[in-house]
Every structure is written in structure tokens, then in C-alpha cells.
Amino acid sequence: MNYKFVSYYDTKIYWTDELDGCGNELIEDLQNATAEVVGNKPINNTLEWCSGPGYWGFSLLGSHQTKTLTLSDIHAPVKPLLEYTIAQNNFENVQFFESDNFKNIPKQQFDLIVGNPPHFCIDPYIPTYNEPRKYKDEGWKIHEDFFNNVSDYLTDDGIIILVENRFGSNPEIFRPMIEKNNLRITNHFGSVKFPLDMWYLGVDKNPV
């Protein structure tokens, strides 16, 4: 396999065209969003949901912003790619689960959960989005299942950050499924790099 890579500090994150969801162009933006939501809170255990090549998680681990990293994705072909990135960077504190949402992830607690899930509930008719697995969450069922189960995996002071697309969604679409699970929206703001397209959603547990 001919892997490409993108560097973040001393970390090389490997990817292929088949497995990339445009995250290779977002790393600095993902880091900016993390700083915006997390602030100075120390992070010990991070989950990257819908990880694909692991741009978000590996960049956090490589820049020492998290001590351990779990990656999860439903798409089995990402596993050897992730293992290659782990080996090339000599990472020891990383695990991967091939999982439909949380179904195959053992119960554990994360203080940061990040994700770049499918951004549209219908076909967006944009040539770039040419593989439904990457972009389509029909009826928002993937998001709904995520919010229905994420509390079991989130520490009481844990933080969730998702990157979404302005042409596919807005905070009010997700608010009902968030609030019904005793979670709350803490932040929503536009991308620095792609302000017309991408936006970020910050969520935590409702303290009441």
C-alpha cells in the first residue's frame, strides 16, 4: 500500500485517498477547536470516534495533549493504516476498536471524545462527496445512537467535540438528541480554516 502522510510537530499521520475524509487538511483547525473548547483542562484519555486515519487523535497524542488514545471506526480497512501510523511513531498507548458506534468498545471512561462523523443526512450533490460511507448519516441515526450511548463512556467532567458541515446541519438539529440524554451544548462555532463550510459542536454532561 502506498501511504501518504501529513506531519504535525514530530508526528507523521498516514492516510490514503480511499480512507481519507478530507481530515488531512483539517489538523490545525482541529487543534484550534480543541483549544477553544478544552482550554487548559488536562486530558488523560481521549477517544476519536469515526476516526478514519486518526488525524485528530494522533495529532493530540503526538503533541502531548493526551496521555492515551483510543480510535474507533466501523470501516475495517482503516486498521492496518492506523497500525502503520502507530508503528512509525513508536506510539505505545493507543488502541483501536472496529465498532459501529460504541457496540464493540469495552466500557471505559474518556475525558475527551472527538469525532468527524458523516455530515449529511441526505445526498448533498457535491462531487467531492462521492462515497456515502464517508458523508451520509441517513436520518441522523449515527449521531442519535452516539448521543444515546456516549454518557456511559464520558467522565462526569468530560468533553465532546464534533466537527460538522454548515451545508448539512446546525446546532438545533442535534439539540433534542443531546438534551434528551442529559447532555448540553457548551459551544458551537465556525471553522477558522473553512468558515463557510465547517463548524464545531462542544458538548458535556448537564450538571443538574
Residue spans for each PLM region:
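C-terminal edge-of-domain segments
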Residues: 201-202
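Conserved SAM/SAH cofactor-binding pocket of Class I
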Residues: 29-106, 112-115, 121-122
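Class I SAM-dependent transferase core
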Residues: 1-38
